[in-house]
C-alpha cells in the first residue's frame, strides 16, 4: 500500500509501458528541476496498457475543451513568429503571403522579404514627399476675366499751391523774408524782397538770428584719420563766406538733442534741395501752431480751381466731391468718395464715359519757396482709402490734355499658413490712425507716427495724431528735428520694423493706369476756348497756355481681371494621393492600413507582456534556501507562475470520506528502476487544473 503522506518527498522517474512496441517500454528524460507541486492521486493508468485498463476500470475521458465563457475576452499570440505567420496568412496586402508560402525555400523567402521591405520603403518615401508638399502650403493662382458694370474709383486732384492760413500768415511772411535774406548771404541772390526792402529790413544777423537752426554753408571735412577716430558727427567746418568750390562745400543746418550733447548737420549737395528742405522744416513748425479745428480757407470754392467737371456727359455738382487741405499740395478735391450718396457707375468704356476736368493751373505764388511745380497733382484710389499724394499721385502738365485710361485688377490672397496677409488688420500690432479701412500704406504711416510720438514726444504734422498729442514745434519740443531725422533714417532702413509688421491685405483692388498726352487747346481753337472759360468763370486767364490743363479719366475696357489664390494641395487631394501610392505599391485598400495598425498594436502589446513576465520572474519568483522555502510554504498555490503547475487543493486520498468511493489501488507491478525517467504521463491530462500550465497568452 502506498504511503500518500510521503508523496511530496518522492522524486521517482517512472517508465510506464504505454505501447505495444517490441521493446515494450518508452523511456523518459530525467527532470532537471524538482517539482514543487505535490502529485495528485492516481485515478487511472496510461492508455497504452490494455490489461491494466480492464482491471482498473473505464478509460479516463479526454481533457475538456474550454468553452466561450471560459476563454479570455482579449487574446494575443504567444510569440512574434506566430503573430507574423498569422498576419502573412490573413492580410490583404499583396506579397505578404509569399513570406509564408515559400518558407521551405529560403531563397524565395529572402527575396520576397527584401522585395516587401523595399516596396515599403519606396511607398513611405513617396508618403514623405506628399506630406512635405502639403505642409509647405503651396497655392495656385486662378485668373478669371469678368465683364460687368464697374464702380468708378475715387479721384483726388490738388492745386500744387500750399495755402497761407490767416492765423499764421505773418509767421509765413517772416519766414519768407528770412529765407530770401539767407539766399542773399549765401549766394548773393537779390530777390524782389531784398531789392525793395532796402534799408527797412533788419540787419542780416538780427534777421537770421531770430530763427533757430539757420541754414549754413559747410565745408566738407577731409577723410577721417585713424589717429583721430573720436570725431563727433558735427565735425563739418562752418564757414559763412568760403570760396565757392563744389567739391569742397555743402549746404545744411545743424540739429542737436535736448542737452546739446550730440549734434549733426543735415546737409545736401544741391543748394535748391537744401533751401527747400530747410524751408519745409520751418514751415512744418509754423503749421503746428494752427488749432485742431481747421480754419476756413480764404480761397474761393471749387470754381476757382476747376473750370468744368463732367462725368458720363453729365455735369458734376457739389455733392460729388469733398475738400481737404494738404500741407505740401494745397487744396485738394476728392470726387466720388465714400461720402457720395450715389457712387458713379461706368457702363461703357471710353473717354466720353468717364470723368473730364478742366483745371486752372496758374501759380498764385502763395509759397514759391515750397512749391516749385506748376500744374496739378492727381491720384486714383478706392472709395474707402485715403489719398497718399506723395506715394501714388502723378502731376498734370499745363497746356496739355492728359488722358488716363484705367484697368481694374483684383487680388484675393490666402492668409494663415498659405500667405502673410491680413483680412482687416485686426491682427496687426499697429493702431490704425486713419478713418478708413486697413491698407498697407495706412499701417506704415500709422507705425511711423506711433514711433514719432513714443520717441520724440510729439506727432508729425503730415499724419493723423491721436487725441491728447500735439504736433511737433521746436518752440515746445526744441529737439524734435534731431529726433525726426534720426527716426527717418531708421525708418528707411526698416530698423523700426514697420514694413515687417504691416502686412498686405488679403483683398486688394488696383487700377492700372496708362497715360496719353496731347497739346490742348490747339493753336486754332485756343482763342475762343480761353474766351469762353473767362466769361463762364468771371476770371481772366493771363498766361493762357500755362493757365489751364485738361484731364480725362476713364475705363479702357469693362473687362477686369481677378487673381485669386487657392490651396494647391488640400486634405482631400492629399488622401487621394496617399491612397494612390498605397494601391500602386501594394494594391490594397483602407482596410489594409487598419491591418497594419493592428499588427503594430499587437507587436507593442506582446512586447509589453513579455517584459512584464520577465519583470515578475525576476523580482517576484521564489528565492532559494530556507527563505525561499518559507516563501513557497506561505504562498498560495494560485499565485505560483505557470511553470510550477499549481493544482487545486483536495483532501488526502489516504483518508476516504464517508459516502464516497475509495480510490482505486495501484495494482501494477513496480517499475524497473533501470528505466526510471521523467516520462510524460497521460494521467496529467486528467488532473484537474492542469490547464493552468498551458502557455497560452491571454488577458
UniProtKB/Swiss-Prot annotation:
Q: Which UniProt keywords apply?
A: Cell membrane, Cell projection, Cilium, Cytoplasm, Cytoplasmic vesicle, Disulfide bond, Flagellum, Glycoprotein, Ion channel, Ion transport, Membrane, Sodium, Sodium channel, Sodium transport, Transmembrane, Transmembrane helix, Transport, Ubl conjugation
Q: Where is the composition biased (Low complexity)?
A: 227-238, 656-667
Name the phenotypic consequences of knocking out this gene: Scnn1a homozygous knockout mice develop respiratory distress and die within 40 hours of birth from failure to clear their lungs of liquid. No other obvious pathological change in organs is observed.
Marked site: Cleavage by Furin: 205-206, 231-232
- Positions of disulphide bridges: 158-332, 256-263, 309-316, 421-506, 443-483, 443-502, 447-498, 456-483, 456-506, 458-472
Superkingdom as given in the UniProt entry? Eukaryota
State the protein's name.
Answer: Epithelial sodium channel subunit alpha
**Gene assigned in the entry:** Scnn1a
